[in-house]
Structures are given as structure tokens and as C-alpha cells.
Regions:
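Gly/Gly-Pro- and Ser/Thr-rich, intrinsically disordered tail segments characteristic of DNA damage-repair
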Residues: 1-124
């Protein structure tokens, strides 16, 4: 079943509430089309799956465990560099489109607080 904009809007709103103020603990890229972000709130730990798989693109919380490659791909290393330890500030969506923005407050190499946005455009 294709993911429509209305369903994605409800998912984004629920993620915003559930993951409010969560911090990124880990990032994994189990496959070329999937990114798993482990986020911790004060009381819970969640695994957020961002999947760009053809025919099943989605953003959701998951309890599924994934087998990760021994050597992380370059994209995963880049995401770790810029997002690990970041605090989730906002989850928002482009109205009527299937683009979800995850805004994080992170610390850069100089120790300054910066805002990084991870954009998930879900097609297919």
C-alpha cells in the first residue's frame, strides 16, 4: 500500500509527540535504502526507521532488529558525525507532500550549538 500525504502527516504528528526532546544515541544503515536512528527520551528508547525502499517507503518506530554491515557506509558515517548526540527539536511535514523534516540541535566540531535538519522524501 502506498503511503499518502494524509497518513504521513498523522505519522509525523505522532512522532513529534512521542519523540519530543529525545536525543540520538545511535545511527545505523542496515541496507542501502534504510536508516535506523536510536533515540532516547527520559523514560524510553525508540528505534526510528527511515526507509526509502521502492514500494514500501516509510517513516515509523520499529521494534525490529536489523543486521548491520561490519563497516558503516559513507552516508551513515556522515550522519553520525553531524547528528549523534543531537536533541530532536521538531518533526514537521510539507503540507500535501510526502517530505518529513526532522530538526535536531547538535554540537559541531567547534563546540557550537547548531541546528541540523534531516529530510526524508518518501516516494514509491
Amino acid at each position: 500500500m502506498a503511503l499518502d500525504a494524509a497518513t504521513l502527516a498523522l505519522t509525523a504528528a505522532e512522532l513529534k509527540t512521542t519523540l519530543a526532546d529525545a536525543k540520538i544515541a545511535k545511527l545505523f544503515e542496515p541496507t542501502r535504502d534504510e536508516l535506523v536512528i536510536t533515540l532516547r527520551t527520559r523514560t524510553e528508547t525508540y528505534s526510528l526507521l527511515l526507509s526509502a525502499r521502492s514500494g514500501s517507503a516509510r517513516v515509523c518506530l520499529t521494534e525490529e532488529s536489523f543486521e548491520n554491515p561490519e563497516t558503516p557506509p559513507s552516508f551513515c558515517m556522515l550522519m553520525r558525525k553531524h547528528l549523534t548526540g543531537g536533541r530532536l527539536l521538531d518533526v514537521r511535514m510539507e503540507p500535501g507532500d510526502r517530505i518529513v523534516y526532522f530538526e535536531f540541535q547538535c554540537t559541531n566540531e567547534m563546540g557550537d550549538l547548531v541546528r541540523n535538519i534531516l529530510c526524508a522524501e518518501l516516494m514509491g
